[in-house]
Amino acid sequence: MNTKLKKEIELIRYVRHSILDLTKQLNEVQLNHIPTGMKNNLVWNIGHMVFTQQMLCYTLGGLKPTIDMSYFAQFAPETTPSDFVTQQEIKKIRATFTDAFERLAFDIASGKLESYKSWSLPSGITIDSFQDAMITNAIHEGRHFGVIISLAKLMSQ
């Protein structure tokens, strides 16, 4: 594994741990609440990050995802929360948030993700390698980290 991917792993791990710390004291009502002017909630953002990581790093690169994508499809791009997510489901999402990333880090270290099928984003930007996918994922997670910080502040008021 090259140094760049080690840095990406370190950055994404930091973001994910920070999100879990930031949201651990919030209850299921707070995690499900969609503030006025927003289109999604905290639990949707966390689930969306899981779904997107699997799409970018596995599915779109021609690899089999490591999670139940049928469950996480409710967090796909262009979706919005439609049902109240129970405490049991929140525990599952939070566990998968950690486990799926740690599996990704393991797959990188073991060389499983060296071959990657090229594909293009709707913007026309081409993702040619797994390293490109990791960079794109890190940017995406940083964006949602900012949203989660804002939503968590609103829930704390």
Language model features by range: what are they?
Residues 9-10, 20, 30-77, 119-157:
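Short, contiguous alpha-helical
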Residues 12, 16-19, 23, 97, ...:
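Hydrophobic alpha-helical core bundles mediating ligand binding, dimerization, or RNAP-core interactions
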Residues 15, 93, 140:
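Hydrophobic (often cysteine-bearing) scaffold residues that line and stabilize catalytic clefts
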Residues 17, 28-31, 54, 102, ...:
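Generic structural signal for secondary-structure transition and capping sites
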Residues 25, 45-48, 107-110:
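Conserved catalytic core of Hanks-type protein kinase domains
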